[in-house]
Amino acid sequence: MSEVLSKYDYIIVGGGSAGAVLATRLSENPALDVLLLEAGSKDTNPLIHIPFGLSLLSRFEGIGWGYHTAPQKEMYDRELFWPRGKTLGGSSSVNAMCYIRGQKEDYDRWANEEGAEGWSFDDVLPYFKRSENFEEGADEYHGTGGPLNVSKLRHTSVLSDAFVNSASIAGYQQLDDFNRDDREGLGYYHVTQANGQRCSTAKGYLTQAKHRNNLTVLTRVAAEKVLLKEGRAIGVQVREKGVVNRYFAKSEVILCGGAINSPQLLMLSGIGPRAELEEKGIFVQQDLPGVGQNLQDHLDAIVQYTCKAREGYAVALGALPSYVKATADYAFRRKGIFSSNIAEAGGFVSSSLATQGPDIQFHFLPAILNDHGRQLAFGYGYGLHVCCLYPKSRGTISLQSNHPADQALIDPNYLTAEEDQQVMIEGVRIARKLLSAPDFDKFQGSELYPGVEAQTDEEILEFLRERAETIYHPIGTCKMGSNDDEMAVVDTQLRVRGIAGLRVVDASVMPSLIGGNTNAPTVMIAERAAEFIKATHEGQPVSLAKAESA
């Protein structure tokens, strides 16, 4: 074993959506030495930065973890593909760039019902605004001058236009911004793009910090365990280029690996449920039964149609001229088809079971999508993705073995709650209604999925069991909570319970799913954590009240 004796003030494990934010914010103080460790490579693949390139990213093993779930008992034992970003920027480098914060009630629920005191909407809004450069200008809900550029799309398909126009026919309103008080309706998504290019946290944050002498960024370095001494985190053991090395932290180790990797690393380090650790032959450093529990994710199903007009984004000979033009448009103006995130439009609606605002989200794609884009889907078409926003099903992340290279066992337990089934069934029915609006008359071909034969609840549920997939929003496996909640892994300052000098800062700390895409909230969490850490370092009291200057 080779020991790297360099000591840093802070070691951040994971250079993704949260880690890139933390590394940038903490290294603003030139007196602090910060080490950022990323298991993946640098974000040099050009398809990362071209928004339309996301349709191909899932085929590149080098920038994704390639995870699969355990067999899903309510889905015919299917082992679902679970893509997560493995590159600088993490999943913010491979996602669809939709900028969604969720509902006010989501954060108020965290604070008032789930033990996350100080994380109400009023508390977290300043950190959303701090991170943001909203191209339409600052106001009550949006900020400017932040590293994360948020813009309108530079290109939308006529099929997306038809979807948004279907709102009034179906009894919904058209909305210009889903990040305000009223968000029930349909519209176009704001996206994390700058000048027609993806604005990941690597691009928005790390780019401005990478030349700082006090920030070291190492890629292709796999963390194996947190080093502990007398109840304190003192460093990280890693494997780089086949060699095991150790890096040491003077102040804190901060895990930013996400809802799969962070609980796995905690357990490999001896922090987690005692029985599971002992079964895997791992010495128990801290018995925390909540590590790896409370896994939640948004399940997604596509109502898919063929298109009888040559519109949208097709794999077809007839589409070649449009792609030739698109190449020129993008190369010279950063506009046109290649600036599209494909999931251009969508919306939020309520099922009959909704209690506090919309519980269904839509993403409209003017294309035929098959197996997360890993398989070519020929021909013209379009689809509406249906997502249950507040699933009752709960899953787990557990260890397959005590070997760091072995994938964790991912079991989201999809559709085990009957209410989730009902919400998804209603969502499919609403999606069909929207796609049958008069604006689609000149486009609608045949229904590919679920298929016209699927009409009863039982038949639609059968379709869900056979075809539903993740829409990439896992959270909750290191949840924050109050001191009297034995299942809470971190406190409201994101410190791991019972271990000094160790925090978790990523989507795994969310107590429950927010009503929408999870990347923007993850960035907010990292912004908030940076303030906690700075205050602790400076010996200042940490306030959980909202930031005054943000």
Where are these regions (language model features)?
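N-terminal redox-cofactor-binding region of secreted/periplasmic oxidoreductases
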Residues: 1-550
